[in-house]
Amino acid sequence: MTLRRIDPAPPVVTGGRAERRRAARRAAHARRDSPGVIVSRVTGELFITLGVVMLLFVAYQLWWTNVIAQRQAGGAANNLRHSWEQGGGPDRDAGEFSPGQGFAIVYIPKLDVKAPIAQGIGKQKVLDRGMVGHYADGALATAMPWDKQGNFALAGHRNTHGEPFRYVNRLQPGDKIVVETKNTFYTYEMTSRLDQTPPANVRVIDPVPAGSGFTRPGRYITLTTCTPEFTSTYRLIVWGKMVDERPRSKGKPDALVN
């Protein structure tokens, strides 16, 4: 039997990288969120995302639809005037225009409004494209400006999609509304306004419109739009009477020059 030297075991070193990793995992496990905290965090993130989506939608409705519609309406007005310059001929009856077809331009100088007028009041083909629509279908059909008597009734958006009738509530008696057609400028003078009426009250666009103060046939204009703003609960109505008829060959009427 021989003797041999037994070296002592090397000392255990603590605090190394592996130990630190294990300690970190233990700490993370100890801090693990409860199910309630996780649900609250996820719900909060969903609400934030929903809020961003809603803000984008509002921006689209209030701003971008106006940009697109005003661009479309401007192009339609330019194309309409160009077509007038290319050919003559008399004005046509309402039934000879197809739905969505432009045939006139309306100006409201006090409000700095210039918008093409198209046949019909359809949202997609007319109103949402920034145009003003002429009541021309079925029981709601109304006169044309060149008719010797009748009520030329128009509809337009008050908010979004070009909003050509946004500020018609600011019109006062005596303010001018001008309609330009292929051959003629028709100038109307605002006479009265109905601030609120149900959408079902179609008598406001009668040949002698109810509530306007007119009592006998004449050459009238009616503007209709939604009210209050950003809703379609009621209708706001503006009436006027024709005070001047001027051939385009003689130049613009005073209302568009002064």
Residue ranges and their predicted role:
Residues 1-40:
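Terminal targeting segments of Actinobacterial cell-envelope proteins
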Residues 35-36, 41-172, 176, 180-258:
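Solvent-exposed, non-transmembrane regions of membrane-associated and secreted proteins
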